[in-house]
């Protein structure tokens, strides 16, 4: 295994998880900023005597490459890696959306549009069979994972008409650069950002739910999708990590708390990393784990359906999900090296 972009938060979590993986060998990791320096220079919590290698060296040695790079870079590197016989798990947004949609929302010209048709969307709960043997995986982001898993049972039932989604994220979701996330600016502060339908994860959420509406429980990345619209407003919260999503779903038909819970428990029965709660989820219970905690709630007074979902943005929302995808790609037990229990307190 090799990691490009190992000096970002997602790269650090990949390092932590892959170093403990009993079935794979981490042969190298790169960072332009830390090349030639010891791992501990970037990550004092990790214990490893190796140095950050050159990107070219990692690409040459690794059989599977994780791209934990800024948007726009993976589309340049993935073709080279695939041509050399490597398999790729991309943590950026480069292969999650059709090229024309990507360009409209990310404002980056797509340099490898043909590869999008080969990429498999990396949400195992919905794409498990597709991921087995995949060469290129487009790993979803944290908000999208939480929102999709919160609403997927309603979409699969064919009753989802739309949703209003509010997301709350710890500051690590913004990456390692301190602009806008410095302690003095986020401490004792809560603020929305990219409101008014401008967040670039919106088309990914809509595409996911549209595929489920059209295809049902098990979906194909490039299969049929129905139109669905949702509103999404993210907020930055003064905590290090964690995502909490509250989705108010517009649904068809008559519902009760009992029927709603039964739908969710049936949909997620047997899923190793999704827990349907009786109470309300909280981010702290998921930290360090690859688990998503979900709670559907029928509001009898108004007849509304609310769904809450919590996860660790750096694990199930990023690196843990990437390792889950790796396990499926290689035919390994899906839960290998992935913690279900969180850290507490």
From Swiss-Prot:
Places the protein is found: Cytoplasm
Database matches in InterPro entries: AGPR_AS, AGPR_type-1, NAD(P)-bd_dom_sf, NAGSA_dehydrogenase, Semialdehyde_DH_NAD-bd
GO function term, MF aspect, one: N-acetyl-gamma-glutamyl-phosphate reductase activity
Protein EC: 1.2.1.38
Superkingdom of source: Bacteria
Keywords in alphabetical order: Amino-acid biosynthesis, Arginine biosynthesis, Cytoplasm, NADP, Oxidoreductase
Stored SMART domains: Semialdhyde_dh (SM00859)
Catalytic activity: N-acetyl-L-glutamate 5-semialdehyde + phosphate + NADP(+) = N-acetyl-L-glutamyl 5-phosphate + NADPH + H(+)
Pathway(s): Amino-acid biosynthesis; L-arginine biosynthesis; N(2)-acetyl-L-ornithine from L-glutamate: step 3/4
Positions of the catalytic residues: 142
GO BP term, pick one: L-arginine biosynthetic process
GO CC annotations on file: cytoplasm
UniProt-listed NCBIfam families: argC (TIGR01850)
Function in brief: Catalyzes the NADPH-dependent reduction of N-acetyl-5-glutamyl phosphate to yield N-acetyl-L-glutamate 5-semialdehyde.
Family: Belongs to the NAGSA dehydrogenase family. Type 1 subfamily.
Protein name from the UniProt record: N-acetyl-gamma-glutamyl-phosphate reductase
Species annotation: Thermus thermophilus (strain ATCC BAA-163 / DSM 7039 / HB27)
Gene: argC
């Amino acid at each position: 295994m090799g990691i490009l972009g190992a000096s970002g938060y997602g790269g650090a979590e990949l390092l932590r998880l892959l170093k403990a993986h009993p079935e794979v060998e981490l042969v190298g990791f790169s960072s332009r900023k830390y090349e030639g320096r010891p791992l501990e220079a970037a990550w004092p919590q990790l214990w490893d005597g190796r140095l950050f290698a050159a990107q070219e060296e990692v690409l040459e040695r690794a059989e599977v490459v994780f791209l934990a790079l800024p948007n726009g870079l993976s589309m340049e590197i993935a073709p080279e890696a695939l041509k050399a016989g490597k398999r790729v798990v991309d943590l950026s947004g480069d292969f999650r959306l059709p090229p024309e949609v990507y360009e409209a929302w990310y404002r980056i010209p797509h340099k490898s549009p043909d590869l999008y048709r080969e990429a498999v969307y990396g949400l195992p709960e919905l794409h498990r069979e597709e991921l087995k043997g995949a060469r290129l995986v487009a790993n979803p982001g944290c908000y999208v994972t939480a929102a999709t898993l919160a609403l997927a049972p309603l979409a699969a039932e064919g009753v989802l008409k739309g949703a209003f989604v509010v997301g709350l994220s710890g500051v690590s979701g913004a990456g390692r650069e301190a602009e806008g996330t410095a302690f003095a600016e986020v401490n004792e502060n809560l603020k929305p950002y990219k409101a008014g339908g401008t967040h670039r994860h919106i088309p990914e959420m809509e595409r996911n739910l549209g595929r489920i509406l059209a295809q049902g429980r098990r979906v194909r990345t490039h299969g049929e999708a129905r139109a669905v619209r949702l509103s999404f407003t993210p907020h930055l919260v003064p905590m290090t990590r964690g995502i909490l999503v509250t989705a108010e779903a517009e649904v068809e038909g008559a519902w009760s708390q009992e029927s709603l819970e039964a739908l969710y428990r049936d949909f997620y029965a047997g899923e190793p990393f999704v827990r349907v709660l009786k109470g309300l989820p909280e981010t702290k219970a998921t930290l360090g784990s690859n688990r998503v905690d979900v709670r559907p709630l029928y509001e009898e007074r108004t007849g509304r359906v609310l769904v809450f979902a919590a996860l660790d943005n750096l694990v199930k929302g990023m690196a843990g999900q990437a390792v889950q995808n790796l396990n499926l790609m290689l035919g390994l037990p899906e839960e290998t090296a992935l913690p279900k229990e969180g850290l507490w307190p």
